[in-house]
Amino acid sequence: VKDRIALAMIEDAERSGLLKPGATIIEPTSGNTGVGLAWVAIVKGYKTILTMPETMSDERKSLLRARGAELVLTPGAKGMQGAVDKAEELRDKIPGSIILQQFDNPANRAMHEKTTAEEIWRDTDGHVDILVAGVGTGGTLCGTAAGLKRHNPSLKAYAVEPDSSPVLSGGKAGPHKIQGIGANFIPGNFVREYVDGVIRVKNDDAIRTGRELSL
């Protein structure tokens, strides 16, 4: 689903005049959105610099570099906030660069409302009453929930976050091992009116379940 938001954010920035030919796209990422951005950017002729916590997997780093992105690694202890801070620092230094702001960019959420929600509704013949999604930017959960609730107002949507960094639940940010979710801050695309509850998942449970599902 990350390729669709990459395209949406880039084309929105082009239409608004913020992204000009030959520009550099800078974005903090745990890797998922970065893959989509690097792919769309190279097709459209933009340079991509991605800031990422050093604790992300080697596979993610290799995949991003293979897509032509330049990686700038940040201290793992600072989580995604460290990557955000570094991206802003680079933007201020590099002329003609832009941060697409996936955590706050409404084009992220809107794309899921327009496409992901409609695909789920169509493919389930409307037989969906619960949506559960991990929260990184909040775009997937909240955009999809908004679209599905338009079809079924009684649908319930639940956010998943790391138990050791329960920011959405009102707790304190902390280190965790679940890549792609739990940014350690509440992103602008996390819109509480679309969320009916938060599920906290322990590191070991997430890792074990991921391995079981891969078999």
Predicted segments with their positions:
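PLP-dependent amino-acid enzyme catalytic core
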Residues: 1-215
